[in-house]
C-alpha cells in the first residue's frame, strides 16, 4: 500500500515594523517576549532556556543573552521599532534593554509596568539566614 505524501502548509512570514518587548525581570529569572502591536507573540526567550541554571539565571548577563536570542528570531519579521515594557525588580532590567538596543532596534518608548499593590496581599515574611 503506497503512502500518500504528507503535505504541510507553508508558513507565511508576516512583516511587522513596530513591536512591543515585554521584559519580566524577577529575582530568579528574566523572560523576554516580543509581540506585535496587538499583543500576538512573535518570539520569546528566557534566561533559563538560554542555558543558565540555578543562581546564574538571575544575572544581568543571562538576561542579555535571552534578549539577544529573542532579537535574532524577530529580525526575520522585519522588525525595526520597539516599545519596551519592563515588569519586576530583577537584575536583568537594564541589561535586557541595552541588548535590544545593540541588536539594532530603535527603542521608541520605555515603560515600567511593575504591579504595585494598593495594600493588597500580605507579603512573605522576612528571611532569616
UniProtKB/Swiss-Prot annotation:
One GO cellular component term: ribosome
Any GO BP: translation
Pfam family, any one: Ribosomal_S11
GO MF annotations in UniProt: rRNA binding; structural constituent of ribosome
UniProt keywords, alphabetically: Ribonucleoprotein, Ribosomal protein, RNA-binding, rRNA-binding
InterPro entries given in the database record: Ribosomal_uS11, Ribosomal_uS11_bac-type, Ribosomal_uS11_CS, Ribosomal_uS11_sf
Highest taxon above the source species: Bacteria
Family in the record: Belongs to the universal ribosomal protein uS11 family.
Self-association state and partner proteins as the record states: Part of the 30S ribosomal subunit. Interacts with proteins S7 and S18. Binds to IF-3.
Functional summary from the UniProt entry: Located on the platform of the 30S subunit, it bridges several disparate RNA helices of the 16S rRNA. Forms part of the Shine-Dalgarno cleft in the 70S ribosome.
Official protein name in the record: Small ribosomal subunit protein uS11
Annotated source species: Histophilus somni (strain 129Pt) (Haemophilus somnus)
Gene this protein is translated from: rpsK
Amino acid at each position: 500500500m503506497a503512502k500518500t505524501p504528507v503535505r504541510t502548509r507553508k508558513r507565511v512570514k508576516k512583516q511587522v515594523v513596530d513591536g512591543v518587548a515585554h521584559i519580566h525581570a524577577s529575582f530568579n529569572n528574566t523572560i523576554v517576549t516580543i509581540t506585535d502591536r496587538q499583543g500576538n507573540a512573535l518570539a520569546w526567550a528566557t534566561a533559563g532556556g538560554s542555558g543558565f541554571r540555578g543562581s546564574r539565571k538571575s544575572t544581568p548577563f543571562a538576561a542579555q543573552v535571552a534578549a539577544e536570542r529573542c532579537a535574532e528570531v524577530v529580525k526575520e519579521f522585519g522588525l525595526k521599532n520597539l516599545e519596551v515594557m519592563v515588569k519586576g525588580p530583577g537584575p536583568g532590567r537594564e541589561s535586557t534593554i541595552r541588548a535590544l538596543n545593540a541588536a539594532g532596534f530603535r527603542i521608541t518608548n520605555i515603560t515600567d509596568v511593575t504591579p504595585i499593590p494598593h495594600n493588597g496581599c500580605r507579603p512573605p515574611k522576612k528571611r532569616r539566614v
